[in-house]
Amino acid sequence: MDEGTAVPAWVEPQISRIGKTDLVIGTPSFNNASTIGYVASVAAVGAREHFPSSGVVLVNADGGSIDGTQEVFRGSEAPPDIERIAFSYRGIPGKGSALKAIFEIAARLDAHACVVLDSDLRSVEPNWVQKLAGPIFAGFEFVSPCYIRHKHDGTITNNICYPLTRALYGARIRQPIGGDFGVSRHLVHTYLEKDVWATDVARFGVDIFMTTTAIAESGRIAQAALGRKVHDAKDPAAELGPMFSQVVSTLFDMMIRYEHVWNTPAPSGAAEMPGLQMADDDEPDPVPVDVPRLIASFRNGVREHSQALALALGKRASVIEAVASSASDADVGLSCEEWALVVYDFAAAYRRNIEHRTSLIRALVPLYNGKVASLVLKAKEMSSRQAEELVEEQCRAFEESKPYLRDLWE
């Protein structure tokens, strides 16, 4: 292994002994001892059930857990012919570095397909392996997940990643940062060749990097209907700030990298792919959201980041300031149209102002929190299925405002 590898040298003999395999199933982890054993054992069952004659290797790339995550992974149930590799990855601490390590092993083993499963999953089933790996064996390059999720789960996806990816590339990939996916041999090598692994791609930016690169550079893309996703969901008010910053900075970086793909008269991305229909009785477990905390972040953040807001929004910053100073919490937040324009303004400002990129992303966080708060309040009496129409409304606003982005970009 070379100096830039995310895989420690002591793993090399095991990789050399295995030599080659058909399918690598990777689980990035950090203190997931309570769930990773279940994920690994279900993955092994699924691999043998659906790909009985294929060589399979399970890989756990861990971020230095102190709860015995690696030991639980090694002790999980698996047929004797399925190899298991567990180690602490090298490099920047983060999910992206873990995935880089998994991809490096998949490349070394010349695996035809690489599947990644989140290590905090409580709803994974054996058929997930078939749904994520099967299309790769059939000739697809990338398989993105499609879940039934609670209306307050996936707020970064619903409010920026999905609408922006759909508007830019014409690709209706419902969960572009879903965490569970299938990747072809060719795309694994494409990812590893990119000079991005010292950026936010090494952290939570990795999922949107993977999806966008797949849209822009690979062949066929599929979506896998995986049903309900039950995992350790996070309150956006309490835990998603750093994740938002890393995802959105990467999203904007990808816009700059692939402007030749999206900034054309007609979108050239993947064709529309079917999503997953939800019945009214499929309501997922609720995800708590601290709305007052989100609103406080919005109000305080608009005051704190006034200079960055002026840089990104120009005269329209005063409109945001007026909304933030509203006396009523019910009136706080941005409409779908306003939010789409704000994101486009920030993307263009991020491109123009290299030296201010960090401050711009920080300034966008409270506006995002205000948007999430308004969406939560609007969806209060809705089922998760009904709330999906609010996401569609947001997507349409991004699509209809795309000419505004093109004008900004020139």
PLM features per residue range, with description:
Residues 124-146:
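Conserved donor-nucleotide/metal-binding helix-loop-beta segment in metal-dependent transferases, i.e.
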Residues 61-71, 121:
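A conserved acidic beta->alpha catalytic loop
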Residues 245-410:
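Terminal low-complexity segments of carbohydrate-biosynthetic enzymes
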Residues 27, 52-65:
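Short beta-strand/loop segment that forms part of the nucleotide-sugar
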Residues 59, 70-97, 108:
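Conserved donor nucleotide-binding strand/loop of the catalytic core
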Residues 110-122:
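Short beta-strand-to-loop acidic/aromatic patch adjacent to the donor-nucleotide binding site
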Residues 1-45, 410:
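N-proximal low-complexity "stem/linker" segments adjacent to membrane-targeting elements
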Residues 153-250:
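Conserved catalytic loops of nucleotide-sugar-dependent glycosyltransferases that act on lipid-linked
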